[in-house]
């Protein structure tokens, strides 16, 4: 088979083992990201939003004094908290994906 440009059986076996390990690691990472709770807050701390590591909304907390300050202020603080939580969540996901794929030299996936 060596004359056909195919890898030897040992190389092929190693490639399959590596692919299986990557699949297991990716599943574990997915579970870890799902279990994470990442908090983003408005600058004044009166609005907080929690997202998972996969950017799924989990909780919202709005301080009573924020609600009393009116609709516009409440909307602005809520949006600020959401943007903060999203930025932290996506950065965490990217960092963890780069850890997983760092040694693979896959285009667009870190490393």
Swiss-Prot record:
Belongs to the YbaB/EbfC family. Keywords: Cytoplasm, DNA-binding. Binds to DNA and alters its conformation. May be involved in regulation of gene expression, nucleoid organization and DNA protection. One of its GO terms (molecular function) is DNA binding. PANTHER family: NUCLEOID-ASSOCIATED PROTEIN YBAB (PTHR33449:SF1). It is found in: Cytoplasm, Nucleoid. Homodimer. The keyword Plastid does not apply. Pfam families: YbaB_DNA_bd (PF02575). This is Nucleoid-associated protein SynRCC307_0025. It comes from Synechococcus sp. (strain RCC307). The keyword Cytoplasm applies. One of its GO terms (cellular component) is bacterial nucleoid. It comes from the Bacteria.
């Amino acid at each position: 088979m060596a004359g056909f440009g195919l890898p030897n059986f040992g190389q092929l076996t190693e490639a399959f083992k590596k692919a299986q390990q990557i699949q297991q690691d990716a599943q574990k990472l997915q579970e870890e990201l799902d279990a994470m709770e990442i908090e983003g807050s408005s600058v004044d701390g009166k609005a907080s939003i929690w997202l998972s590591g996969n950017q799924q909304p989990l909780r919202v907390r709005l301080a009573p004094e924020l609600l009393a300050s009116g609709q516009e202020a409440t909307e602005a603080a809520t949006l600020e908290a959401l943007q903060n939580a999203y930025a932290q969540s996506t950065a965490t996901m990217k960092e963890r994906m780069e850890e997983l794929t760092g040694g693979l030299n896959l285009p667009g996936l870190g490393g």
